[in-house]
Amino acid sequence: MKKYLLIIIGVTLVLILLWWAGIERTIKLMMRADIRFILLAILMYCISVLIWAVRWNTFLKGANINVSFVKVIEGVFIGIFLNNLTPGARTGGEAVKVIFIKKASSNGSYSKVFATVIADRILDVIPVVVFMMLAFLYALTIHARVLLIILGISAIILVIILLMTTVFSIKEKYALSALLYLARIFRKIFPSKFSMSEDKIKEKLLGEIREFKETFLRLAKRKRRLSSTMLYSFILWGADILKTYFIFLSLGGRITFLQVLLVRMASIAVAMISVIPGGIGITEVVQSALFLAVGVEKALAVSVTMLDRLISFWIPTLLGGILVLKNRKLLVSSS
């Protein structure tokens, strides 16, 4: 019930934003969009998703997990769908991606697949931190104090998350303590699902943690694979920023690539702390406000944001939902 209430609040924020910018003017602007640049924006989004799948597939191959590339792409969209249903940093889809690929593969285990997902997430954070630093330097030149604070704090938080994830991935003691704590909570909530003793749970968790750690370290030691996946990550985020830039060009807007970079990084930072699933409403309001901060007219700012969200949020969420329904038997099957 709370989730639905938050979604209603988010949709209300979108409607208020459209009313503030002028619904008729905003719709007219979007209807006049140059289809050539819109197609380029869609192409950039498709490239970013394809690169994401290639990067994850590289880690899956490195872990010797046999799964078709089509299933990897499906796994990415299923993850997007479920991430867009969860608030904040949107990590709800990662667990389902693990389940999906484990069941879709011929030889994958949960701990091995989870190691590839964590490695993929770590490689996703590094370019964001780099681009945030570039945006921070640009914000310094234009004396945007609010943006400087947002970007600075966000970059620090991301680095801390990155370090904590890495430590928990290689230190058995910390990982076991955290998982045992969660197991005790779940045992109280679902006692029938956790009938085994704590010693048995600990033994099972330790086995999974060791397999995860072994897989994670093996992936980390392969320098050539790491170099290629790092390159994929920068291409992915570069395509994401170009997508928004092309949407601006489609509406005849005048903006620099650095301004788009600044707004995208700052809006990602704010979306991380959104309590509304998928950042609905919050992302639209924040991104539009940030475009205003760099001198974009309000109707244009809102039009760009709406088209951006249509391409990178609503359509992928719909596709992901369709793929969840298509693969529902696989996802709920026991194995």
From Swiss-Prot:
Keywords, in A-Z order: Cell membrane, Membrane, Transmembrane, Transmembrane helix
Name of one Pfam family that matches: LPG_synthase_TM
Record-annotated membrane-spanning stretches: 4-24, 34-54, 62-82, 122-142, 148-168, 231-251, 266-286, 304-324
Location(s) in or outside the cell: Cell membrane
GO cellular component: plasma membrane
InterPro entries from the UniProt entry: L-PG_synthase/AglD (IPR022791)
Topology of the protein relative to the lipid bilayer: Multi-pass membrane protein
Family to which the UniProt record says this protein belongs: Belongs to the UPF0104 family.
NCBIfam families: flippase-like domain
Protein name: UPF0104 membrane protein PH1989
Organism of provenance: Pyrococcus horikoshii (strain ATCC 700860 / DSM 12428 / JCM 9974 / NBRC 100139 / OT-3)
